Amino acid sequence: MNQLAMVNTTITRPLANYHSSVWGNYFLSYTPQLTETSSQEKRELEELKEKVRQMLVETPDNSTQKLVLIDTIQRLGVAYHFENHIKISIQNIFDEFEKNKNKDNDDDLCVVALRFRLVRGQRHYMSSDVFTRFTNDDGKFKETLTKDVSGLLNLYEATHLRVHGEEILEDALSFTVTHLKSMSPKLDNSLKAQVSEALFQPIHTNIPRVVARKYIRIYENIESHDDLLLKFAKLDFHILQKMHQRELSELTRWWKYLDYENKYPYARDKLVECYFWATGVYFGPQYKRARKTLTKLIVIITITDDLYDAYATYDELVPYTDAVERCEISAMHSISPYMRPLYQVFLDYFDEMEKELTKDGKAHYVYYAKIETNKWIKSYLKEAEWLKNDIIPKCEEYKRNATITVSSQMILITCLIVAGEFISKETFEWMINESLIAPASSLINRLKDDIIGHEHEQQREHGASFIECYVKEYRASKQEAYVEARRQIANAWKDINTDYLHATQVPTFVLEPALNLSRLVDILQEDDFTDSQNFLKDTITLLFVDSVNSTSCG
């Protein structure tokens, strides 16, 4: 008899009855032999890469062709091969613009908007005043722009890099959405697909792997596409996909070793979805160790979340919280027997992390991981305490705690620890205590989760979400609470963009995980992580199952 079966059955538990795994042992079939990259594939990739590099070198920086080429390379998911060249080119484009901006009379909306997005995407502040020439005396965008579909599409994409106070970009967003929606049915198939995908999920708030997978199909159907670029993008995606399949196979074996079904039947079986999150943060070949560590962490977070949220009693959670804070094997005897397997996984996770970091001379990084872990586990207990005492807190009090329970900052700090780069003490302290991007990413995660999971959670005993807190505090309707949550999410994105543009003392590799974590949450439809049988299943299939050479890309 397993330990859960021996737990007192008279205890009332708020069981969530989650569905079984969508994937099961599916990825075990991807053996090392099946997922090995052949020497011919490696050689062909290098040859194509050199040809694309030559295209970048030979195309003048201050030309429309260079902007389009960089944009295409980024969308196809192969920009990571040419980071330095792209960085230098965009710097040159920005410097040339700054030098001549008073003389700049470019009336091509497509070019102005594309340049704006690419320049801001490389963390250079270009003023949104570049768009005033496309407005009338009353500040409204000119109706003649509605004839320029590509211009509207590029302007729409550019608006998602806005910061606080940029009213012209707020107006541009409304203007472009209205007109792109109305004209979409009349467009040719290629342009219609681009508009439809952009309205569904703009580039800036989408994860790069999903952008690449879908754009390969769109680009293939553009008559003027470059065959060499397309071939390179497909081969690169294919090679990375095989690497991801191999990693999923290894992690599935680890998952089976944990004996999930017997030891954690109260929790969601989400190994593959957790790996999807890790890949959304770091997809490149140099981040294998980071993906493995992040996947294990997100698995631990998921099981712990379900333990606190959908199984354990408050009296069981108090000693468990204390044990996690102590992070010592001697705390094992103080917790309920059925909790011990999870606690052991937690201890093993930190032991493994410490050993790996010690090899790299970075053992002191674990200190930051443990600080964030302690904040996180205590915030769970606070939530359980509110539930036990039927407390619906004020919105600000709720957010202070709930932006910790959502675990974004703990994941973010772990990203920095395992990325393989040197991170100074000052950078850790800035990210934890001073940044806008970390709390903004946490808030997006929290509020999006509360919006999409609200109805599902009402089916059982559950702690208050932002929706309940707002309704009670402001005597508002649920619909008004949803509107407020979405407003705060939009503002949080502006905070992320602000740090990305202005926190120039912080390297880009430090900020990108927070940006990608926010993107991962933003793409979720309904309660996709919990009920991953629909949109998320299709997305995972696109990335890790379907061949990029197949005719259908979703």
Swiss-Prot record:
Disulfide bonds: none annotated. Mg(2+) 2 binds at residues 305, 309. A motif (DDXXD motif) lies at residues 305-309. Coiled coil: none annotated. It holds the Pfam family Terpene_synth_C. Binds 3 Mg(2+) or Mn(2+) ions per subunit. Transmembrane segments: none annotated. Mg(2+) 1 binds at residues 305, 309. One of its GO terms (molecular function) is magnesium ion binding. Keywords: Lyase, Magnesium, Metal-binding. It comes from the Eukaryota. Mostly expressed in stem trichomes. Pathway: Secondary metabolite biosynthesis; terpenoid biosynthesis. It catalyses: (2E,6E)-farnesyl diphosphate = beta-bisabolene + diphosphate; (2E,6E)-farnesyl diphosphate = (Z)-alpha-bisabolene + diphosphate; (2E,6E)-farnesyl diphosphate = beta-acoradiene + diphosphate; (2E,6E)-farnesyl diphosphate = (E)-gamma-bisabolene + diphosphate. The keyword Flavoprotein does not apply. Its EC number is 4.2.3.47, 4.2.3.59, 4.2.3.-, 4.2.3.15. Mg(2+) 3 binds at residues 449, 457. The Asp-Asp-Xaa-Xaa-Asp/Glu (DDXXD/E) motif is important for the catalytic activity, presumably through binding to Mg(2+). Belongs to the terpene synthase family. Tpsa subfamily. This is Sesquiterpene synthase 14a. It comes from Solanum habrochaites (Wild tomato). The lineage of its organism: Eukaryota, Viridiplantae, Streptophyta, Embryophyta, Tracheophyta.
